[in-house]
Every structure is written in structure tokens, then in C-alpha cells.
């Protein structure tokens, strides 16, 4: 075993058998709003490009103010097409998707290098919209 410098992270990665670098896991945290303003629905609320190719292994969303009256629903798109067959949701009165009654389902896990990623807000709470949305992308590379 040895180590190999990873220019994407600036870290030394474990090198597996035969000199091949072990897979690297990253978590991208994307702020989709400020902390206090009510969320509004819309497409491409956030747009960014993938810094490297990777496999999407999990997604999560959190808010600082919970939606009230209905769930907050978020979609994640690569090049304009959803990567989720069941969208990411935060249930009424909750602050995280980790406890969602219906968890998100990833239908397209392969994210290309430099792919345009957009985050849509499809639904906000009907009484209180929710605020402070962050979306987490769990990515494995290598």
C-alpha cells in the first residue's frame, strides 16, 4: 500500500493493489438559497458544472426552516434531464429528507465530467414555504 497525490482534492489517496488508486468519495453541498428568505418554486434555481466524472450514490436535502402544509420537493438534473425517478422531498414540518416518508430514488447515477447540473424546486410548503435549502450530492470517483 502507498499513497498517490490527487490533484482534484489536494489529498493523498490510498493506492490499492497494483498501484491503482482506491475510489474517492466526495460530498458536494450546494446552497440553493439564503438562510431566511422563503423558498419559491422554479427551474434551475442553482446551476453548476461537475468538476469531475463520478457516480451519484446518494442525495439529501436540508432546510433551516421546515416547510409547513405540504412537502418541499426538489429535482436534480444533468444536462436538463432528471437523475431521480422519485424526487427528493422534505416532509411537512421536517428539516431533512433523511426522514422522508418516500425516499428519493436515483435513476441515472453516472455524472459526466463538466456536465451541467441544475437544481429545481418543484414544490414548497403550502403554509410556510421553508428556507435555507441545501442539497447534498454523494459522489464516488475512480
Indicate residue ranges for each PLM-predicted region:
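Glycine-rich, low-complexity segments
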Residues: 2-40, 57, 77, 81-95, ...
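Extracellular carbohydrate recognition
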Residues: 126-134
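Extracellular Ig-like/FN3 beta-sandwich strand-entry sites
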Residues: 53, 112-116
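Short beta-strand-plus-loop segments that form exposed binding edges in beta-rich domains
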Residues: 119-127
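Beta-rich globular "head" domains
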Residues: 44-78, 120, 134-140
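Terminal beta-strand-rich extracellular "head" domains
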Residues: 62-113
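Beta-strand-rich interaction surfaces with strong enrichment in secreted/lumenal proteins
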Residues: 33-37, 45-48, 105-109
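Generic, low-specificity signal for short hydrophobic/alpha-helical stretches with a mild N-terminal bias
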Residues: 32, 38-41, 99, 103, ...
Amino acid at each position: 500500500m502507498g499513497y498517490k497525490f490527487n490533484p482534484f482534492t489536494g489529498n493523498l489517496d490510498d493506492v490499492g493493489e497494483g498501484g491503482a488508486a482506491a475510489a474517492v468519495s466526495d460530498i458536494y453541498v450546494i446552497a440553493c438559497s439564503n438562510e431566511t428568505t422563503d423558498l419559491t418554486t422554479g427551474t434551475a434555481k442553482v446551476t453548476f458544472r461537475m468538476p469531475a466524472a463520478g457516480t451519484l450514490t446518494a442525495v439529501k436535502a436540508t432546510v433551516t426552516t421546515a416547510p409547513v402544509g405540504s412537502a418541499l420537493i426538489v429535482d436534480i438534473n444533468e444536462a436538463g434531464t432528471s437523475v431521480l425517478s422519485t424526487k427528493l422531498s422534505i416532509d411537512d414540518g421536517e428539516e431533512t429528507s433523511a426522514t422522508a416518508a418516500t425516499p428519493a430514488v436515483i435513476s441515472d447515477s453516472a455524472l459526466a465530467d463538466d456536465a451541467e447540473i441544475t437544481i429545481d424546486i418543484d414544490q414548497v410548503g403550502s403554509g410556510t414555504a421553508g428556507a435555507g435549502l441545501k442539497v447534498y450530492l454523494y459522489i464516488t470517483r475512480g
